[in-house]
Structures are given as C-alpha cells and as structure tokens.
Amino acid sequence: MQRQAGLPLKANPMHTIASILLSVLGIYSPADVAGLPTHLYKNFTVQELALKLKGKNQEFCLTAFMSGRSLVRACLSDAGHEHDTWFDTMLGFAISAYALKSRIALTVEDSPYPGTPGDLLELQICPLNGYCE
C-alpha cells in the first residue's frame, strides 16, 4: 500500500477487519497489521529518557536496555493527541519506569529511516515482582 503526500493511507478492507479484531483481542494495534513491522520487547529497562519540544508539539524518546540484547530506541509525539491523554499517560509510564528502574514491555514500529528511533506504540510497566509474561 502506498501513501501519496498529504493523503491518508487507503486500507484494504480485510486488513481493516483483521486489525480491529486483533486490536479488540489485545494482540496487536491497527498499525501492526497495515504499517511497518512492529516488535514487542519484554523485560527491558529504560536507560535514557528525553523530552523534546518541536514547535507546538512535544516528543519523548527513550532508550531501553536488556543485558545481552541490543538497545531499543523509540519516540512518541503528542502530535494528533492534543485532545486526549494518550501522550501524557505514556510519558508518565516512561518516567515512572525510569525512576523506579522497573522492567518494561514496549511495542515499537520500525522506522522507515535506518538509524532513527522507531515509533513507540505501547509501553507497559512489568509487575513489581519481576518480569513481564
């Protein structure tokens, strides 16, 4: 599927149905089905956290680490989320995980540009007793 500049991505009806079903089941977000590849990283810790101002918008980026694995870099912008609490909630989770050195699970969509952070789709703090299942 190709996106023309300024136009929304035209979704295949089967992808739309599949993405809604998988999203309702809590397996994948709609971006997983129609967009770039996504990856779930479990039991990582937040090593770095940065908040950036970009014009009228905010963006936070984090670097997550797990011993024996490569670093994961992901960012989330509040662009498009000005009227809801999604960005604030995810930022709160990231700050808490960083401050408490908690393990996290994060879902990241690959960046189309090599060497740049992926898009953070979801962030969860693992239970205090240890590991994400």
UniProtKB/Swiss-Prot annotation:
Transmembrane segments: none
UniProt KW keywords: Disulfide bond, Host cell membrane, Host membrane, Membrane, Secreted, Signal, Toxin, Virulence, Whooping cough
Residues in the signal sequence: 1-34
SUPFAM superfamilies: Bacterial enterotoxins (SSF50203)
Compartments, record wording: Secreted; Host cell membrane
Pfam families xref list: Pertus-S5-tox
Highest taxon of source: Bacteria
InterPro entries to which the protein is assigned, alphabetical: Enterotoxin, Pertussis_toxin_subS5
Xref: Gene3D superfamilies: 2.40.50.110
GO molecular function, one term: toxin activity
Assembly, per entry: Pertussis toxin contains five different chains, S1-S5. They are organized into 2 functional subunits: A, composed of S1 (which is toxic) and B, containing S2, S3, S5, and two copies of S4 (B binds to the membrane receptors). Dimers of S2-S4 and S3-S4 are held together by S5.
The protein's role, per its UniProt record: PTX oligomer B binds to receptors on the eukaryotic cell surface and facilitates the translocation of the toxic subunit across the cell membrane.
Designated name of the protein: Pertussis toxin subunit 5
Native species: Bordetella pertussis (strain Tohama I / ATCC BAA-589 / NCTC 13251)
Gene transcribed to yield this protein: ptxE
